[in-house]
C-alpha cells in the first residue's frame, strides 16, 4: 500500500491505465506474514496485502478511494514484438503423448495465462482450431510453450513473425528494434561481430575492460530468433547477452533465410537403418532408427535448396538369396536434435513445429504431397491475380 487505510467491506474505485474507472468492493483484506497470509480487518500504508473480491484487476491499475481517487503513475508495459499461431496438433500422432489436445484445452490455458502474463496478447482467428499469440520475443513465448508441454499439452506452432507498424507520416513499414548488450572475452569478439552483423545489427558502443569486451547494438527483433544459441556456440559458451525493446524504426531489409531444403517422409512407420544409410549421404538426419514417423514429417535437411520426398521406413529387399543373409556393416551419423528455439528458427512458412510432452517434431502444414502441390498452385494463382 502506498497511502491511506483500507478495510474489509470497503467500497473502492479501480482506475485503469487508460483512465477508466470501475467501482468494486473489498470482501477480505489479507496481510502477508512470512510465507503465509492472515485475515485482518484493515491495512495501512507500507503493508503488503492481498485483496479478495476485486474483479478484472490488471497490473498497472490503481485501487483508490471512490470519493477522491488519486491513481499512481501506471507501469508502462513494453508492446509485443513477435507473433505466432498456436493450433491443434492434427498429425497422425495426435493424443499419443499428451493429455490436453483439443482447441478448447489450449484456448482455456492461454486465457488463464493472461491473468499473470501481462506482456502476452491473444487474438481469436477465423480458424476455430487456431489462436494468434503475441509476446515480447521468442524467449517469452518459448517459456510459455515449454510450460504447456510440461503440463501435458500438445499443439502445433507456426513460424514466428515480427509485428510491423505503418509510419503514419511516410507510409513506410516500421519494425521493432531491440537494444542488444553483449559481454564477451576479447578473443571471442570476432564471432559475435560476425553473427550480429549478418543479422542487420548496428554497433552503437564498444568498451574493452581488461580483456572483457562490452558491446552494444541495435538489431531488428526478427533477427534475434535463434541468436542466443548460435552466439553461445560461436563463443564456447562465454558470451552473456541481454536485449530489450528500443524503438520502431524503418525496416532494415530482408535477412537470408534457410539455404537448404528438407526431406519429407512419404509414408508412416518406424525408421529403418537401411533407409537412413542411403539418405544420410544427401543431408543431415533429424531421426534415428526405430523412431516413429508419419507422412508429411520432416526427417532430414537436404543438401540442396529444394525439398525432397523420401521413404525412411524402407527395409532391405529379401529377393536376392546371396545378399539376404549377409551381414552388412551400417554406420550412421548421429541425428541432429533441435531445441524448441532452434526448431522455431528453422521452419519456413509452409511448416510447423509439433510440440508434445515427449517430442519436438518438424512437419509440413499439408501432410500429403498432393495437398502441397495444390497449395503451391493456388499460391501462384493468387500472386498472379494481385
Report each predicted region and the residues it spans.
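Conserved nucleotide-binding/hydrolysis modules and their immediate coupling elements
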Residues: 1-84, 94-96, 260, 269-319, ...
